[in-house]
Each structure stands twice: as structure tokens, then as C-alpha cells.
Amino acid sequence: MWCNPIICALDTYDINHALRLTKMLYGKISMVKLGLEFFTAHGLSGVQAVSDCGIPIFLDLKLHDIPNTVGKAISVIKSLNIAMLTIHISGGRDMMLSAIDSIFGSMIKLIGVTVLTSIDDSDLKDIGIDRSSIQHVMLLSKVAQEIGLYGIVCSAFEVQEVRNQCGKDFKLVVPGIRFEDDYSDQKRVKNPKDAILAGADYLVIGRPITMSSDPIQTVDAILSSINL
């Protein structure tokens, strides 16, 4: 980890809000996450503006396309100061290998997306996947590690089993971190302490921080709850 496990998810198209929060949280968190909403609105220049604030960037684009397209997209993205970038493991081995080839010469770490935290077993069944969410995550995690990705994104419910399967050096990024009274649109979620105890390396936390009246106090409370 860079300094602590918290990645603040700036899920917004408002660049001024994103910059304000990034500057406020400098030195308090490990990274900020910029996703599709922000990237669609502001592109490479917007990512660069946030990066200029000095906090490492977790660019969560969940790339999923043919190998050549993903490779070329990453060749453009790697001009930015990005710490981690997400790609879908379900894009296949050739796509992931193309992504790995394309980050050569940069500091970018590739993180594989397994099963979104908004999806549960019934959703998987609807799209023709007969495995449970944890079985599917375990399968995809194994493939990602064999290919050579830096780590994966999974829910806190799968962390312990993935850790046992993949070992201590494979990084586990856990989104869907909520407090007990706020599960919103996420289905497979846990609170910060439970996620860390289960074996998470990074916690992606959005609204509990970004919608707080005092984001710094909220971050301090989260760190205190996990004894950091």
C-alpha cells in the first residue's frame, strides 16, 4: 500500500467538486478513484488535472473490448500519471495480455474486475452463468493471477477465499464499502473493518466520504475503526 487502504471514489462529473475533495484529502488517503462518469465528461485533461493535485489516481474504466482496441486505449492512457487501471477479466486472456503489453514502460498496475458488487447470484443466472458469485470470482481471480495482473476487484464477501487461493502478494481492491445504514445500490457489501479483517488491501469508499459534511473527519473515523 502507499500509505493507508482508503481509495476515495470521486463518482461525479463535477470537476470542481472532484478537485476540491482531492485537495482536501491530500495526505489522508492512498488514492482517488475516477470512473466512467468523470472520464466521459472530462477525458484525459480532467484526469491530469486531478493527478496534478498529487494524489495517485485509480482510473476505473473497466475496459472490456477486443485486444487491439484495449491495447491502443491503454497506450493513450499511459501518458497520464496513473497508479492503477481496471480491465474486465471476462475480456479474456488475449485482451489481458494486450493490456499488459501496452503498460510496458509505465508505472500503471492492472486490476482485474471480477463480479460487480451490484450483481448477485440471481443476476448471474439471468445472463447464463450457473456458478455462484463467489465461485465465479474465484475462477476469474485464478485466471487474472495466472495472466499476471497486479490484483483484482472483488466484494468483501469473496476476499478471504481469494486471499487463501492467491496468496498475500495479489492485491485485493474492495468496493461497495458502506456503513451499516447505507447499502444504496450495492448488494454484496460490508463495512470497512470487516473488509480489512477479511483480507482487503484497498477499500474503495465513495458516498460516505464525498457526501459527508466533514470528509476529513469521516476518513479519520474509518481509519480509527480499522486501527490505522
Curated annotation (Swiss-Prot):
SMART domains: OMPdecase (SM00934). PROSITE patterns: OMPDECASE. The active site is at K62 (proton donor). The keyword Lyase applies. SUPFAM superfamilies: Ribulose-phoshate binding barrel. InterPro entries: Aldolase_TIM (IPR013785), OMPdecase (IPR014732), OMPdecase_AS (IPR018089), OMPdecase_bac (IPR047596), OMPdeCOase_dom (IPR001754), RibuloseP-bd_barrel (IPR011060). It is an enzyme of class 4 (lyase). The keyword rRNA-binding does not apply. It holds the Pfam family OMPdecase. Keywords: Decarboxylase, Lyase, Pyrimidine biosynthesis. CDD domains: OMP_decarboxylase_like. Its EC number is 4.1.1.23. Pathway: Pyrimidine metabolism; UMP biosynthesis via de novo pathway; UMP from orotate: step 2/2. Signal peptide: none annotated. Catalyzes the decarboxylation of orotidine 5'-monophosphate (OMP) to uridine 5'-monophosphate (UMP). This is Orotidine 5'-phosphate decarboxylase. It comes from Ehrlichia canis (strain Jake). The gene is pyrF.
